[in-house]
C-alpha cells in the first residue's frame, strides 16, 4: 500500500493525531511525516466538530461506504471488511463519570495497516489507558496491537461495571433477608442496566471473535490469540449478566411477596381491632339512640357500670380471640 503524507490527515480540530514510532511510543503527527505500515498514524476525531465532519466527508483516504458510519450512523457493535480496510463499531462503559452507566459510549474505527481513524461524540475513558501506555513508550507498536489493546481496555471497563452490578445485587439480596425493601425504582434501574449491557456486549463479543478468526493482514497470530482471549473473557461476563438478570427476577418476586405479606399483616390487624371493638360500638350506638331515655341515666353509678360492662365485653372478646388462636 502507498504511504500517506502527514498533511493528508491534518485535521485542525482533531482530538489528537499521533504517529506510532513502532517501538511502543508516539509522537505528534507533522505535515511532512510519512505514514506507512512501520509507522502508522492514529487520528482520533469528534465527528460533531465542523472540521472533523468536513474531513470525514471529503478525504479520499476513506471509502465512501464508511463515511456515514464514522459520522455517527452506526451504533451497534459490528465489524465489516472494506477492501484493504476494516470498519469496526464498539461500545464502552464510562462507569466512573456522572453519566448514567446504562448509556454506553459508541466508538467507530476504520483502519488498515497504515492508519487508524477513530471517531466518537462523548469521551471514551477506556482509550485513556491506551494513550497512557503509548505516552510511556509501553503501548502497541502497530495497528494490530493497537486494536487488541483497545478491545482489552474496553473489556476491562465492562468487566468492572458488571462486577459493580453484581456487588449491588449481593447487597440487595442481603437486605431482603433482613426484610429491607430497596427504594422504589432501584431494582428496575439495575435490571435495565443489565439488559442494556447484554444487548450491546453480546454482539461486541461476536465482533472480537470474528476479529480473532479473520485473517487480517495487519494482525499476527499472537494478536489473534489475545483477541480470542478477550472474546472469551467478555463471554464470561455475559454469563454473569444472564445470571444477574435471573437473580433480579427472583428478587422482584421476593419483594412482591414481602410487600404482600406486610399488607396482609396490616389488614389482619385492622380486622382484629374491628372485631374487638364491634360489640362495644354496638352498645354505645344502641344507648345513644336515646328514644325512650338512656337506661340507667337517673342512676348515679350508671355511667361507671356501663364503662365496666364495656371493659368486660372487650376483655371477653379478646380472650375468645386468643383462645381461638386468632391473636
Curated annotation (Swiss-Prot):
InterPro entries: CorA_cytoplasmic_dom (IPR045861), CorA_TM1_TM2 (IPR045863), MgTranspt_CorA/ZnTranspt_ZntB (IPR002523), Zn_transp_ZntB (IPR023714). The keyword Zinc applies. It is a multi-pass membrane protein. Zinc transporter. Acts as a Zn(2+):proton symporter, which likely mediates zinc ion uptake. Residues 1-273, 322-327 are cytoplasmic. Keywords: Cell inner membrane, Cell membrane, Ion transport, Membrane, Transmembrane, Transmembrane helix, Transport, Zinc. It is found in: Cell inner membrane. It comes from Citrobacter koseri (strain ATCC BAA-895 / CDC 4225-83 / SGSC4696). This is Zinc transport protein ZntB. Belongs to the CorA metal ion transporter (MIT) (TC 1.A.35) family.
Amino acid at each position: 500500500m502507498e504511504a500517506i503524507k502527514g498533511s493528508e490527515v491534518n485535521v485542525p480540530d482533531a482530538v489528537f493525531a499521533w504517529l506510532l514510532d513502532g517501538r511502543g511510543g508516539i509522537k505528534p503527527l507533522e505535515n511532512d511525516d510519512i505514514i506507512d505500515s512501520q509507522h502508522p498514524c492514529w487520528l482520533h476525531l469528534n465527528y460533531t466538530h465542523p472540521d472533523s465532519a468536513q474531513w470525514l466527508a471529503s478525504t479520499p483516504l476513506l471509502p465512501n461506504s464508511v463515511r456515514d458510519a464514522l459520522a455517527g450512523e452506526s451504533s451497534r457493535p459490528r465489524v465489516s471488511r472494506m477492501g484493504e480496510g476494516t470498519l469496526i463499531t464498539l461500545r464502552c462503559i464510562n462507569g466512573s463519570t456522572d453519566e448514567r452507566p446504562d448509556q454506553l459510549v459508541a466508538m467507530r474505527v476504520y483502519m488498515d495497516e497504515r492508519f487508524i481513524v477513530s471517531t466518537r461524540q462523548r469521551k471514551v475513558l477506556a482509550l485513556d489507558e491506551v494513550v497512557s501506555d503509548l505516552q510511556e513508550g509501553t503501548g502497541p507498536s502497530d495497528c494490530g496491537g493497537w486494536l487488541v489493546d483497545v478491545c482489552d481496555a474496553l473489556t476491562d471497563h465492562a468487566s468492572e461495571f458488571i462486577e459493580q452490578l453484581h456487588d449491588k445485587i449481593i447487597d440487595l439480596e442481603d437486605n431482603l433477608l433482613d426484610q429491607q425493601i430497596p427504594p422504589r425504582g432501584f431494582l428496575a434501574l439495575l435490571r435495565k442496566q443489565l439488559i442494556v449491557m447484554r444487548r450491546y456486549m453480546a454482539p461486541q463479543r461476536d465482533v472480537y471473535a470474528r476479529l480473532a478468526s479473520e485473517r487480517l493482514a495487519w494482525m499476527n497470530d499472537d494478536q489473534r490469540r489475545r483477541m480470542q482471549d478477550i472474546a472469551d473473557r467478555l463471554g464470561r461476563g455475559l454469563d454473569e449478566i444472564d445470571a444477574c438478570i435471573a437473580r433480579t427476577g427472583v428478587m422482584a418476586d421476593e419483594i412482591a411477596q414481602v410487600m404482600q405479606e406486610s399488607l396482609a399483616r396490616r389488614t389482619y390487624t385492622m380486622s382484629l381491632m374491628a372485631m374487638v371493638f364491634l360489640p362495644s360500638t354496638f352498645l354505645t350506638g344502641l344507648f345513644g339512640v336515646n328514644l325512650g331515655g338512656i337506661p340507667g341515666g337517673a342512676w348515679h353509678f350508671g355511667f361507671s357500670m356501663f364503662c365496666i360492662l364495656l371493659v368486660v365485653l372487650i376483655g371477653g372478646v379478646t380472650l375468645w380471640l386468643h383462645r381461638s388462636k386468632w391473636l
